[in-house]
Design a protein with these regions (language model features):
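Conserved C-terminal portion of the radical SAM core fold
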Residues: 71
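Nucleotide-activated sugar donor-binding and catalytic core shared by glycosyltransferases
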Residues: 1-66, 74-184
Length: 184
């Protein structure tokens, strides 16, 4: 293991990412506590599976703003199924800097993205993975990630447990220091 090249990119842009955080929240009118949610895997984009995920998210939409940069198939589901709430924000995809700026100061990230599991771990942001497994196990063993699946009751339980806990402060992962390319 020589490191993680994706973390090199994050480290190289970290100052811009952190600076972007307040700017992007202001631009998007995010004023309180919020979750960032990304769903893009075909297995999660069926109407049945999205219904389970959104039922879990809606339980928290009165207390938290829920920000979703949306995949086109996800937008279609949202439009077809009237998934509207004043605290659910459906966005067009954001730039890398703005997206990670938003992630860096979020209360929680829910995702099915492997890369985002790594980025949240490095940014020390709590992450719940909407899958039954991960190809990034280090994000669970040493990071801030927990794999929870997509069953509504499990999503509700894990969000409650995670936001109420002090948990999720990951450890510094060896070689995730922005110097992977030098070691290669």
């Amino acid at each position: 293991n020589v490191g993680n090249i994706m973390i090199d990119t994050l480290e190289k842009n970290l100052e811009k990412i952190l600076k972007s955080s307040d700017q992007i929240k202001e631009k998007l009118n995010i004023t309180g506590k919020y979750f960032v949610v990304t769903i893009h895997r075909p297995s999660n984009l069926s109407d049945e599976n999205l219904a389970k995920i959104f039922a879990g998210l809606k339980e928290f939409s009165n207390e938290y703003q829920i920000v979703l940069p949306a995949h086109p198939r996800l937008k279609k589901y949202i439009n077809d199924n009237d998934v509207e709430h004043e605290n659910i924000f459906i966005l067009n995809p954001l730039s890398y800097i703005d997206f990670l700026g938003l992630v860096s100061s979020s209360d929680l990230v829910l995702t099915d993205s492997g890369g985002l599991q790594e980025e949240t771990t490095h940014l020390n942001v709590k992450c719940l993975t909407l899958r039954n497994e991960t190809e990034r196990p280090i994000t669970v063993s040493e990071g801030t990630n927990k794999v929870i699946g997509i069953e509504t009751e499990k999503i509700i339980y894990e969000i409650n447990t995670t936001i109420q806990s002090k948990l999720s402060k990951g450890t510094e992962i060896k070689f995730w220091d922005g110097k992977t390319s030098e070691r290669i």
